[in-house]
Structures are given as structure tokens and as C-alpha cells.
Regions:
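The feature captures the beta-strand-to-loop junction immediately N-terminal to the Walker
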Residues: 50-52
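Helix-to-loop junction immediately C-terminal to a conserved catalytic motif
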Residues: 65
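Conserved ABC ATPase "signature" region
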Residues: 118-135
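Conserved ABC ATPase signature
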Residues: 139-143, 147
């Protein structure tokens, strides 16, 4: 195993303030979806946003990445611009360039601040760790869905980010590939990367999460340790969700 290949460039996450939403409001289709949403997450471990489809999980991730801006309120998780530039994001829809796997990884490094003289070596490390060396020269879009998703995640990790945001990382994947990706997520977390995952899969949340944020209709109904959420949910909505009554 290659040591420390996922260790963030700035590994001093202990010095960072918690991730904070302060009175965040967001309009979708001219209607308020989030209304004065406030919460706080620490910068260690794996946090999981869970809830039914359309509950607000993906919108929250997009606010964190800066892909969308709030209509009011603040999204704060660092005043350090170097940290903000080291965010890895994998959207639910796989988006790969019409290039080889190798060139997909190089492209991400080319638009980052990664040291120029270390980019090719970084690609070799990533390919070796992910066991993708045999497909390095193949078009990324010609791979299986599972391999494409693995390339997407490794591409996000190529820059050695401090934060990794994953939106439904195992959707539509077979059990074997799901296990590979979940093991990768655990390895990356142990290296010191803060990970936030969006999912509606309660079993995946149980396996991975240190803490759970349960979304329902644009609100965070519960935010607690994983064990507490599944053993003793406080709200009717959380209980119904765990019974499979709020999946749609």
C-alpha cells in the first residue's frame, strides 16, 4: 500500500473552524427551499447527509462547494484560501472527459496548484493505488460504470484535498464495487481528509458515518452521532425514513 498518498497538502485541519451554515436561505423556482438554515459540522471524520429524494442534501453540498450561492446567510468553513482551493467534489452524475483515464487525472492536476514537477508521479501513484494501471490509456468513458465512478473519485483525490464531498457515490453500483469504494472512503478519512457524503442508503450511512444529518423538506430534523440516530431517532420523520416510508 502506498503510504500517505491521500494526506492533504494542508493537514492541519485541527486549526480550522467547524463547517457552518448560518441563517442560510435558498430559493428554488422562486420559492424558499432553505429558510434560515443553520448547523455546524466539525472537520474530522465522515459526516453523512441522509434523507429522501428532494430533501435538500444535494443543494446543501452545492452550497458548500460554491456551485450555487445562498440568497441570504453565510456558508463558512474556512478563512484560509489555500484550504478552499483544495476541495474534492464528485457529483452524482459521472462526468468524465473524452480522454484516457491518465489524461483525466492529469487535467485535474493541471488546473490546480499541484506542483508541476510532481504531476506525472502523482498520476502513477493514483493509478497504482486504485489498480487502474491496466486501463490508464483507455478512454475513461469506455470503462464500466463502476470503474468510471472510481476514476471520478480518484480524480477528485488527485490534488490531495482537505475536504471531499461525495454525492451518492455508490448509486447504481454492484455490491463488489460498492465495497471497494466504501473501503477507499474509509482509507481517505483515516489519512485526515474531511468527508461529507450524500446518500439515501441507510445501510451505507450505518457503515460509514461518524455523524448523521437527517434532511426533510429543506430542514435538518436531526443531527447526531450515527449510533444515536439509528438506535434512538427523535423525530417521527426519521423513524418513518428508517422504515422505508419516506424514500420518495
Amino acid at each position: 500500500m502506498i503510504k500517505n498518498i491521500f494526506k492533504p497538502f494542508n493537514n492541519n485541519l485541527n486549526s480550522l473552524l467547524p463547517i457552518r451554515f448560518h441563517n442560510v436561505s435558498l430559493k428554488l423556482d422562486n420559492n424558499f427551499f432553505f429558510k434560515k438554515l443553520s448547523f455546524e459540522i466539525n472537520t474530522k471524520g465522515i459526516s453523512v447527509f441522509i434523507g429522501a429524494n428532494g430533501a435538500g442534501k444535494t443543494s446543501c453540498i452545492k452550497l458548500l462547494t460554491g456551485l450555487i450561492k445562498p440568497d441570504s446567510g453565510e456558508v463558512l468553513f474556512s478563512t484560509n484560501k489555500e484550504i478552499l482551493n483544495l476541495i474534492g467534489y464528485v457529483p452524482q452524475k459521472i462526468i468524465l472527459l473524452r480522454r484516457s483515464v491518465e489524461k483525466n487525472l492529469l487535467h485535474t492536476l493541471s488546473i490546480s496548484n499541484y506542483p508541476t514537477n510532481k504531476k506525472k508521479q502523482r498520476v502513477k501513484e493514483i493509478l497504482k493505488f486504485a489498480k487502474l494501471e491496466h486501463v490508464a490509456k483507455q478512454s475513461a468513458r469506455n470503462l464500466s460504470i463502476g470503474q468510471q465512478q472510481l476514476v471520478s473519485i480518484m480524480r477528485a483525490l488527485a490534488i490531495r484535498p482537505s475536504f471531499l464531498f461525495l454525492d451518492e457515490p455508490c448509486a447504481n453500483l454492484d455490491p463488489q464495487t460498492t465495497q471497494i469504494i466504501e473501503n477507499l472512503i474509509k482509507t481517505v478519512s483515516k489519512a485526515g481528509v474531511k468527508i461529507i457524503i450524500v446518500t439515501h442508503d441507510v445501510f451505507q450511512a450505518k457503515r460509514l458515518a461518524n455523524d448523521i444529518l437527517f434532511f426533510h423538506n429543506g430542514k435538518i430534523i436531526e443531527h447526531t452521532k450515527t449510533k444515536n440516530f439509528f438506535k434512538n431517532p427523535k423525530s417521527k420523520e426519521a423513524k418513518d425514513f428508517q422504515k422505508g416510508l419516506l424514500l420518495k
